[in-house]
A protein has these predicted regions:
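Sec-dependent N-terminal signal peptides of Gram-negative outer-membrane/periplasmic proteins
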Residues: 7-179
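Bacterial N-terminal signal peptides that target proteins for export
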Residues: 1-5
Length: 179
């Protein structure tokens, strides 16, 4: 934990490792502003962050993903935390979304890790990620986000940690080789 905390203290850029096949995300309880800065470097997008934007996020991808998938993942993270990315000229403003007031507050500092909101990028191998969306959606909480990124056949899931763990188990069972 101390090494990770030190790493995050220096720069979140180390938490996103570039690879020939793409980028592997590994943010654990990271400041959302630092995550935004790193996503900006990866995607070459410029963000203006509203002073009200704060909180800690966990984003993990099991395999390297494209920079487009990284941005799609970041948008899901924002949405699940009641935030939105609003393009403004060459910049993208990160602000509280209008829906944020109606959403229940997320426990950023919850003592129960299963209650923390996490985002997972899940590589699907044997079935279409898009086909999994209608199967998984009814199993998710109302605040959760689920998106398929067909170009690299990945699912992006944002929900409470306990639900994401359960969904990953279900996905693993569905995504079996038919051989």
């Amino acid at each position: 934990g101390a090494m990770l905390a030190g790493l995050l203290g220096l720069s979140c850029a180390f938490a996103a490792a570039a690879d020939q096949g793409g980028i592997t995300l590994n943010f654990k309880d990271a400041d959302i502003r630092e995550v935004a800065a790193t996503i900006g470097q990866i995607t070459h997008k410029n963000f203006i962050i509203d002073p009200r934007v704060q909180g800690r996020v966990t984003v993990v991808s099991s395999r390297p993903v494209s920079s487009d998938a990284v941005y799609a993942t970041f948008l899901s993270v924002l949405e699940v935390h009641g935030l939105a990315a609003a393009p403004s000229g060459d910049m993208i403003k990160i602000v509280p979304s209008l829906e944020a007031r109606q959403m229940p507050g997320y426990p950023y500092n919850s003592s129960t890790p299963g209650d923390a909101v996490v985002t997972e990028v899940i590589q699907i191998t044997n079935v279409s990620a898009t086909q999994l969306v209608p199967v998984l959606r009814p199993l998710m909480s109302t605040e959760a986000q689920l998106a398929a990124y067909p170009q690299s056949n990945v699912l992006i899931v944002s929900d409470r940690a306990s639900n994401v763990t359960r969904l990953m188990d279900i996905i693993q069972r569905i995504d079996q080789s038919t051989d």
